[in-house]
Each structure stands twice: as structure tokens, then as C-alpha cells.
């Protein structure tokens, strides 16, 4: 294994800490979360809310890497007008390149996102994280971010995650 390539990949992954979430920037959120903070939020939700029939370890791995490709392609949102198939192709190419030189193959985790029971659960937690963050920013900064909550609700099945995303009132902070 080439340590120079491994070091480069490890350092590049750390830049997720500096990449702000594009949707929050577009809406004028002050000090918006980074993509890395979002990924942590999704992993936190997976850890805490994982049902017994879901492999928690697999789901956590998927949550950690689910937005890694954004290092290279950026945080593409529906407002950017990028065709979903084009976005997926860009992200797959970026992830494949980022996977090179690592001592572990991360490709199965990115391929599982949305496509396995664990991947679908992580995708649901991704939507829940967005809704909860919208509630938080709305409460703290007085912003109208209902579109993010509505977007999450449109993709969440009835049950606990949907109830949490709907949030009857702003959370106490």
C-alpha cells in the first residue's frame, strides 16, 4: 500500500468538514453545518434509532460514507437543475476515485445506500436529519425552512422517523 496515496485520501476526506451544505447556504442560514457534520448527524440517528432487524454496523458504515463523493462533485441539490442520473454518475466516478488507495473497499457501502434494508434506513435517517436541522435552524435563526421538512416528509414512510421529522413544535434548545 502506498502511504502517500493513503495520506492524500485521508486528508482529502477531512475537507468534508469545510464543505457547507448547499441548501442551508441558499436559504441564508448563518454558519450552516458542513457535509461532515450532516454525515455525523445521520450516523447519530442510525446509532440511536436503528431497529433490531437492521444491521447497525452496516448502517453506520453507509451513513459515514454516504456523502463522501461530495468532496469532488460538491453538494448538488435539486435546485441546481442537475439530472439525477447525471448526479449519480458523477458521484459514482468521484467515489470510485476516492476509494482507490484505501486499505478497505468502501464501494459496497455507497452501493448499498438506498438499495438494501440498511441503505434504505440510512437514506430515511438522511431525510430525518435534514428535517430536524431545518427545525433547529428555524427555531434558532427565525428562518422559514418548511420546504426542507416537507421534502423529508414526502420521502419518509409512516412511523417513528416521519413523526420525528414532522415535529409538532420547534425543539427546545
Mark where each language-model region is:
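Active-site helical microenvironments for divalent-metal-assisted chemistry
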Residues: 1-173
Amino acid at each position: 500500500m502506498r502511504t502517500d496515496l493513503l495520506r492524500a485520501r485521508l486528508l482529502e476526506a477531512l475537507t468534508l468538514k469545510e464543505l457547507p451544505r448547499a441548501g442551508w447556504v441558499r436559504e441564508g442560514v448563518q454558519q450552516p453545518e458542513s457535509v461532515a457534520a450532516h454525515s455525523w448527524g445521520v450516523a447519530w440517528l442510525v446509532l440511536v434509532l436503528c431497529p433490531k432487524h437492521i444491521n447497525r454496523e452496516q448502517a453506520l458504515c453507509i451513513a459515514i460514507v454516504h456523502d463522501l463523493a461530495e468532496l469532488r462533485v460538491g453538494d448538488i441539490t435539486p435546485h441546481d437543475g442537475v439530472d439525477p442520473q447525471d448526479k449519480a454518475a458523477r458521484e459514482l466516478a468521484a467515489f470510485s476515485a476516492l476509494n482507490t488507495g484505501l486499505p478497505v473497499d468502501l464501494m459496497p457501502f455507497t452501493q448499498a445506500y438506498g438499495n438494501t434494508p440498511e441503505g434504505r434506513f440510512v437514506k430515511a435517517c438522511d431525510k430525518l436529519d435534514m428535517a430536524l436541522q431545518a427545525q433547529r435552524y428555524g427555531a434558532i435563526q427565525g428562518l422559514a425552512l418548511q420546504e426542507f421538512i416537507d421534502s423529508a416528509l414526502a420521502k419518509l414512510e409512516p412511523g417513528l422517523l416521519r413523526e420525528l421529522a414532522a415535529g409538532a413544535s420547534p425543539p427546545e434548545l
